[in-house]
Design a protein with these regions (language model features):
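Bacterial N-terminal signal peptides that target proteins for export
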Residues: 2-15
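Bacterial N-terminal signal peptides
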Residues: 12-24
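Boundary at the C-terminal end of the N-terminal hydrophobic targeting segment
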Residues: 28-30
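Short, surface-exposed loop or secondary-structure junction motifs
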Residues: 35-36, 144-384
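Short, conserved catalytic-motif segment at the N-terminal edge
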Residues: 38-106, 126, 141-148, 290-292, ...
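Hydrophobic (often cysteine-bearing) scaffold residues that line and stabilize catalytic clefts
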Residues: 51-55, 106-110, 114, 160, ...
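Short active-site loop at a secondary-structure junction
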Residues: 61-74, 93-162, 218-230, 302-305
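Short, well-ordered beta-strand elements
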Residues: 399-401, 407-416
């Protein structure tokens, strides 16, 4: 198997070089994804094709060393696709070459998509950031809050803004350190100790919300940032306001207008041969890797972690945001709404929880907006970027970012849920930024 994987990665690198020769070095080292952006020479938008080629070489070596099974990487600048590669294999158990239209489990990269859905309804005048969550989901009326001395009443209502910025006090069981909350989430079937990839899509969205609403909040609403189940609740709000299942609403208002043809909450039989898979075990730790089954329609469209899609679909979504809410003449959001979403919504008054759930944000020296991590300054963060850039990632290693000042968009798609996730995400970003030459 190892030798076949290495042969596959070498052949993929060779194919990349052949395509470069056919289409020119600045067309990105792989075939242009069918639904991605218009391609352009890297030099025409202030980037170096030779420097972008380092992505192919470096990640090709990572794949050859079995640190990744495969990857799809897309880079756009000034609205033009300047790099696209599909390296390694799609499935380690069946090592056919990775393809640019491979379908990935995007996990928490579903959150920005669901956040956009909520903002669409706000622009429609049907929802407000200040709306109490209980206005749309009555189960959250009169919620309690955990304290060392027991349960107390919430000092204010949980709002839609709290859901969007993860200040609602609805932590993930696997990321919080509060044992009482962990136990309550486990008893409610919303967390399984020792299983970070626990899948709750077998219950309906209504069941999930009813169970979650019975558990006291970890923090007073609006006081503390901790990565959370809030976006799953936000998805239920979108369903309550729109009267439609989340996937249907997104298809009508986002996926179809933007031609995101492969983004959904499960993969139908005709597309299963395109699904990317992970190694059975983490190559660094040997820990077993288990990803969600996307071959059957789930009981709920998990706004927090249930999405699947291609790199080109997510590039179109990201470019829409980079353009201020519009792509190819299809306006999804106002420019002012995108600016609101990608501004700092934590400020100095909201604490970052000293837990693994808080560290998801705090360790990266970013703040948080309405659905995205937002960079507050050019410096401090250990990755290149500029103030105002925004991003998010997914459990299986995926990551995207938009840098408005540099007019730069990056999409990194892998299925590598292990200890090397952060390293590969940062490596991708570093290699993209070093290719800027204007």
């Amino acid at each position: 198997m190892i030798s076949s994987l290495r042969r596959g990665s070498r052949s993929r690198l060779l194919l990349a070089l052949v395509l470069t020769a056919l289409f020119g070095p600045s067309t990105a080292h792989a075939q242009r994804p069918a639904s991605a952006l218009v391609a352009a020479p890297a030099e025409s938008v202030g980037m170096s094709a030779a420097r972008l080629a380092r992505l192919t070489a470096v990640f090709g070596k990572e794949i050859e060393d079995r640190k990744l099974p495969g990857s799809v990487m897309l880079v756009a600048r000034k609205g033009k696709l300047v790099y696209a590669s599909a390296l390694g294999v799609r499935d380690p158990k069946n090592p056919d070459p990775m393809r640019t239209d491979a379908i990935f489990r995007i996990y928490s990269m579903t959150k920005p998509i669901a956040s956009v859905a909520a903002m669409i309804l706000i622009e429609d005048g049907k929802l407000q950031l200040t709306d109490p969550v209980s206005k749309w989901l009555p189960a959250f009326k009169d919620v309690k809050v955990w304290t060392d001395g027991g349960e107390v009443a919430a000092q204010r209502v949980m709002t839609v803004q709290d859901l969007l910025r993860h200040t609602a006090g609805l932590p993930y069981g696997e990321l919080t350190q509060n044992t009482a909350v962990k136990d309550a989430l486990a008893k409610a079937g919303l967390f399984k100790p020792g299983v970070i990839e626990f899948d709750v899509r077998d219950m309906t969205g209504a069941e999930q919300v009813e169970r979650l609403a019975r558990i006291p909040l970890l923090y007073q609403p609006g006081t503390t940032w901790e990565y959370s189940l809030a976006t799953d609740v936000l998805g239920r709000v979108v369903e309550a306001v729109s009267g439609k299942r989340l996937g249907v609403f997104l298809s009508e208002r986002l996926f179809t207008p933007l031609r995101m043809t492969d983004t959904a909450f499960w993969v139908p039989p005709a597309k299963l041969a395109r699904v990317a898979e992970a190694f059975d075990k983490d190559p660094l730790t040997g820990t077993a890797i288990r990803l969600i089954d996307v071959s059957k329609e789930p009981a709920n469209d998990s706004a927090g972690a249930g999405g699947v899609g291609t790199a080109s679909d997510y590039l179109r979504f990201s470019q829409m945001l980079a353009n201020g809410g519009v792509l190819d003449g299809q306006r999804v959001l106002s420019r002012t709404t995108v600016r609101l979403m990608t501004s700092d919504h934590l400020g100095s008054r909201i604490a970052i929880a000293p837990t693994p759930g808080g560290g998801v944000l705090g360790a990266s020296t970013y703040t948080f907006g309405l659905g995205f991590a937002v960079r507050p300054s050019d410096g401090i963060a250990p990755v290149p970027g500029t103030a105002g850039d925004f991003n998010w990632g997914g459990y299986a290693g995926t990551r995207f970012w938009v840098d408005p000042k540099e007019q730069l968009v990056g999409v990194f798609m892998v299925q590598s849920a292990g200890a090397l996730r952060a390293y590969h995400r940062e490596l991708f970003r570093q290699l993209v930024y070093q290719a800027i030459v204007d």
